[in-house]
């Protein structure tokens, strides 16, 4: 798409003044993302960038050959999260001798999934997605550790703050309740 845009712009060069700089941002969905690195390396200077327009491929949004246009923000923030829930493993026949990280992680996940539905204004947009969960290898053994992670997305800083505060409160509460 970038090469196509470059070809079109070159073909209409006499119709605009100034300079066009095409920038490919790598790693836009991971933290800290490619934008920070590009800015630090001076991509917005020499020549100075006065305006910037973003483009992203969204294969489900339009049919082949169509382009959509939107003024203002069109994509959300991306906040990745990873948790390691540590406990004391043991045999499943003696759960009283364990501190079960599977149960604690499950409770955290269920409660975190409720954040958007119960703590974010319904007029705002937010997404909380769990992408991975790992713990244990045997069905009759309570593991000592469970790891899970995912991503949250929002348009506003206030919603990002609500989600972050709620995630921390849930983690602390489950930790206190689980021993």
What are the functions of these language-model segments?
Residues 162-172:
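Short amphipathic alpha-helices in soluble, non-transmembrane regions
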């Amino acid at each position: 798409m970038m090469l196509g845009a470059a070809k079109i712009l070159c073909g209409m060069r006499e119709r605009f003044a100034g300079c066009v700089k095409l920038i490919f941002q790598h790693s836009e969905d991971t933290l800290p993302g490619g934008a920070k690195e590009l800015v630090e390396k001076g991509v917005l200077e020499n020549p100075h960038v006065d305006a910037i327009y973003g483009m992203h491929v969204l294969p489900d949004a339009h049919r082949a050959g169509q382009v959509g246009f939107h003024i203002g923000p069109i994509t959300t923030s991306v906040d990745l999260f990873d948790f390691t829930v540590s406990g004391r493993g043991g045999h499943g026949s003696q759960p009283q001798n364990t501190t079960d990280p599977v149960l604690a992680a499950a409770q955290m996940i269920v409660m975190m999934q409720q954040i958007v539905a119960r703590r974010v204004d319904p007029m705002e947009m937010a997404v909380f997605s769990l992408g991975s969960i790992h713990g244990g290898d045997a069905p009759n053994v309570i593991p000592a550790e469970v790891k899970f992670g995912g991503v949250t997305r929002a348009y506003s800083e206030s919603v990002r703050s609500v989600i972050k505060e709620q995630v921390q409160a849930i983690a602390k509460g489950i930790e206190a309740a689980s021993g």
